[in-house]
């Protein structure tokens, strides 16, 4: 988001193109828990006020345990850069370590050997990460191939953009999902505007990709969710024109919020 001076001398807000990460959910045919995952995906709903039947709630409660993405609390996760300049690596590493002060997980950056988190800057032009322990699935994330990518971070990228993107992707690596897909997300999308926007640059997504990454919400019992957090690092800045509720844009968050801290501490006490 940038400020632009108009002829009257008053600053107006101009939104740069929204770059958001692509959710890397393992396809059913590559997931050993595919029957559980398929059932969970079928319970994704289009609105947060969907009410599930008692038998659905019980089934989802069981799946939430089987399908957990969390690492073991106290784990030391090895991270390895597959490419990128020394400056890009240094800036990424510094931001990633910020998560450690809030939870019982450590990141160890190594230069050789195996690593749970393998980082690229050139796999494609997008930003994405495996969600939690999905990184261990070698069918979907083969050894020596990235489990995380930063397609637009470069030497000259501002520090606040590194903070925004790296904290977000390492949030995924810890098992967090997008805040705008939480069942507690209260904003109302302008579906036609969303479809038009994300089919264009810089994302070029298909309608199915847009539904999967923006419009759909998880079932209320499919994930752990309390209240919607407008300051969450897992929420991207969306232009107000993408909503039909007239409430303006979502925040441009570059640091973890108080609720992010509380949630990650609960995940990894």
Set out the residue ranges of the language-model regions:
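Zinc-dependent metalloendopeptidases
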Residues: 1-269
């Amino acid at each position: 988001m940038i400020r632009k001076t108009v002829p009257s001398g008053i600053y107006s807000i101009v939104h740069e193109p929204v770059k958001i990460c692509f959710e890397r959910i393992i396809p059913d045919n590559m997931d050993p828990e595919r029957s559980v995952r398929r059932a969970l995906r079928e319970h994704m709903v289009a609105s947060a006020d969907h009410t599930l039947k008692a038998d659905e709630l019980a089934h989802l409660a069981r799946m939430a345990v089987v399908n957990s993405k969390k690492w073991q609390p106290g784990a030391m996760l090895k991270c390895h850069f597959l490419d990128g300049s020394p400056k890009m690596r240094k800036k990424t590493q510094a931001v990633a370590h910020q998560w450690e002060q809030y939870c019982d997980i450590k990141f160890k950056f190594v230069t050789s050997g195996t690593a749970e988190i393998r980082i690229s800057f050139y796999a494609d032009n997008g930003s994405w990460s495996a969600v939690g322990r999905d990184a261990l699935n070698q069918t979907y994330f083969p050894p020596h191939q990235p489990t995380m990518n930063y397609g637009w971070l470069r030497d000259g990228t501002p520090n606040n953009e590194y903070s925004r993107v790296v904290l977000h992707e390492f949030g995924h690596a810890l098992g967090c999902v997008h805040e705008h897909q939480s069942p507690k997300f209260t904003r109302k999308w302008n579906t036609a505007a969303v479809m038009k926007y994300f089919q264009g640059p810089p994302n070029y997504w298909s309608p199915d990709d847009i539904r999967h990454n923006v419009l759909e919400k998880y079932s209320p019992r499919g994930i752990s969710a309390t209240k919607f957090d407008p300051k969450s690092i897992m929420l991207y800045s969306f232009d107000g024109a993408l909503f039909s509720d007239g409430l303006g844009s979502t925040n441009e968050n570059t640091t973890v919020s108080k609720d992010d801290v509380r949630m990650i501490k609960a995940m990894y006490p």
